[in-house]
């Protein structure tokens, strides 16, 4: 309730605060303890917002699953999130790299993973519970394409190196495909298709056969 009040009833802000709480609670905790802690402390905030004034036994299964998936997922991602980042520290011990830099790069490369839990809450059809095959196919395709756009925008490379404004466009288009509205999915798909064509053609021109003088 405190998190929901602090977020002013905003679903996105509530999810963001729950994400921070889950990352902190999950740092250094083994898997089972991680789930017990995050599901007990953080998940109720999401359920309070998604199913207000509803007894737990009457809350739809998919709503409960999405809330618990959200907190558990971020609890696990804490292993690659600085400053603790146990997995990154273990990897740096093997490679001989700097632990903090390894943690930062691991979080950067896995940026798409930080978006997936939001998609699960906003588009519960991804859990494949009480939905049609068509719904599953549609949300899965939009999720995958959206992740490609966001990932390329964050990394700064697709078929070739991206300009700063191209990165912003790709990230915005990818995020629009996460929002559970058909029109936003279509807009995002069209923008990403145009960006793909520009990248593909530009890369072909840059790497095409050179004229012999």
Q: What are the roles of these predicted feature ranges?
A:
Residues 1-213:
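Alpha-helical transmembrane segments of multi-pass membrane transport proteins
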